[in-house]
């Protein structure tokens, strides 16, 4: 079997970017949630 390193590189890059977006979305959601909690505590 001959491995196509270019294909593997693109595959890894896609997975990395997908995981990065997923983590970014989680951090963004947590940031909004914590922000709302602070606002509720202030009121």
Swiss-Prot record:
Q: How is the polypeptide modified once translated?
A: The N-terminus is blocked.
List this protein's GO terms for biological process.
photosynthesis
Q: Which GO terms describe its cellular component?
A: chloroplast thylakoid membrane; cytochrome b6f complex
Pfam families for the chain: PetL
Q: Does the record's keyword annotation contain Thylakoid?
A: yes
A molecular function annotated in GO for this UniProt entry is: electron transporter, transferring electrons within cytochrome b6/f complex of photosystem II activity
**Where this protein primarily resides, as one coarse class?**
plastid
User: Its membrane topology, per UniProt?
Assistant: Single-pass membrane protein
Where does it live in the cell?
Plastid, Chloroplast thylakoid membrane
In terms of InterPro entries, this protein maps to:
Cyt_b6/f_cplx_su6
Q: Which UniProt keywords apply?
A: Chloroplast, Electron transport, Membrane, Photosynthesis, Plastid, Thylakoid, Transmembrane, Transmembrane helix, Transport
Cysteine disulfide partners in this protein: none
TM segments?
17-37
What's its job?
Component of the cytochrome b6-f complex, which mediates electron transfer between photosystem II (PSII) and photosystem I (PSI), cyclic electron flow around PSI, and state transitions. PetL is important for photoautotrophic growth as well as for electron transfer efficiency and stability of the cytochrome b6-f complex.
Q: How does it assemble?
A: The 4 large subunits of the cytochrome b6-f complex are cytochrome b6, subunit IV (17 kDa polypeptide, PetD), cytochrome f and the Rieske protein, while the 4 small subunits are PetG, PetL, PetM and PetN. The complex functions as a dimer.
Q: Which family does it belong to?
A: Belongs to the PetL family.
Extra info from the record? Answer: A deletion of this gene can be substituted for by a subunit IV-petL fusion. The fusion protein does not permit state transitions, although all other functions are wild-type.
Q: What is this protein called?
A: Cytochrome b6-f complex subunit 6
Q: Which organism is it from?
A: Chlamydomonas reinhardtii (Chlamydomonas smithii)
């Amino acid at each position: 079997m001959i491995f196509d390193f270019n294909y593997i590189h693109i595959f890894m890059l896609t997975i990395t970017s997908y995981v990065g977006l997923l983590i970014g979305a989680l951090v963004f959601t947590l940031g909004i949630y914590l922000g709302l909690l602070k606002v509720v505590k202030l009121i």
